[in-house]
């Protein structure tokens, strides 16, 4: 007589979403709510908080906050000091000096802290639909391949950081990086004439993937179908009212 055996269900890979937060608590909270509303109820969210004025203090279920508001995890002053010839004409804005470089350093640290991989989601986006298909472990990345970044004099492309799955085990196995001290955004000697000073967020990642083909492959998705993006400069102190107006305009995506 044959005994009935219960088939074990295949365990789904962990769904991890990471947000780098910088002074936008209202937007970050709405971004998480939009994730929950569009199929991400059980996704775990990690917030890496680099704020110097408006930290993320909201307690939310399934959300872990890594507090770097005083440089506890990444000391940006010490990191920037490693680049004494950095050029403030690239990658600097009032209230956010070398923000892109700091963002890249943060995502590289997240590769260490979340070694199974994750979807990087910016704090100033609201989702329109589920992002389940981004979690494709057969790919090294899933996201939008911007072949040439606008206003980049060297036409360097990048994987847009607004919404991008990164298969960290696959990427690290082939030596890919998110931050590379030799390919940065404004940190190197030579200023605007140095091509290696024009690697914005996601540029090093894309270049390393292309250099490792076919060992590393990625999937291009038009993320415009998945999100509304507030736009650049959402972290600036003088746009609080614009945050409110934008969230009100798109309240159907997060409320």
Please give the residue ranges for each predicted region.
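Short, charged/polar "capping" segments at the starts of alpha-helices
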Residues: 26-28, 52-58
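Short, acidic, metal-binding catalytic loop of nucleotide-sugar glycosyltransferases
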Residues: 34-42
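Short beta-strand/loop segment that forms part of the nucleotide-sugar
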Residues: 42-53, 67-71
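Active-site-proximal specificity loops/subdomain of glycosyltransferases
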Residues: 55-113
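Short beta-strand-to-loop acidic/aromatic patch adjacent to the donor-nucleotide binding site
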Residues: 116-126
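Conserved catalytic core of nucleotide-sugar-dependent glycosyltransferases
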Residues: 127-203
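Catalytic core and acceptor-binding pocket of nucleotide-sugar-dependent glycosyltransferases
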Residues: 172-246
């Amino acid at each position: 007589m044959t005994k009935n055996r219960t088939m074990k269900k295949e365990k789904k890979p962990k769904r991890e979403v990471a947000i780098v937060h910088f002074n936008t608590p209202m937007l970050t909270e709405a971004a998480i709510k939009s994730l929950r509303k569009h199929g991400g109820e059980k996704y775990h969210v990690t917030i890496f908080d680099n704020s110097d004025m408006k930290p993320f203090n909201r307690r939310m279920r399934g959300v872990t906050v890594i507090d770097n508001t005083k440089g506890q995890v990444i000391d940006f002053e010490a990191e920037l000091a490693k680049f004494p010839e950095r050029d403030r004409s690239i990658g600097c804005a009032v209230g956010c000096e070398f923000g892109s470089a700091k963002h890249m350093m943060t995502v590289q640290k997240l590769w260490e802290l979340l070694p199974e991989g994750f979807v990087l989601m910016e704090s100033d986006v609201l989702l329109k639909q589920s992002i389940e298909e981004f979690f494709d472990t057969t790919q090294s990345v899933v996201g939008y391949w911007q072949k040439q970044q606008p206003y980049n004099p060297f036409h360097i492309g990048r994987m847009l950081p607004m919404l991008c799955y990164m298969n960290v085990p696959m990427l690290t196995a082939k030596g890919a990086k998110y931050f590379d001290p030799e390919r940065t955004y404004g940190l190197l000697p030579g200023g605007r004439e140095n091509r290696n000073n024009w690697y914005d967020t996601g540029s090093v990642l894309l270049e390393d993937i292309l250099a490792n083909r076919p060992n590393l492959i990625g999937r291009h998705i038009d993320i415009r179908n998945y999100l509304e993006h507030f736009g650049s400069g959402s972290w600036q102190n003088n746009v609080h009212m614009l945050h409110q107006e934008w969230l009100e305009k798109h309240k159907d995506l997060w409320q």
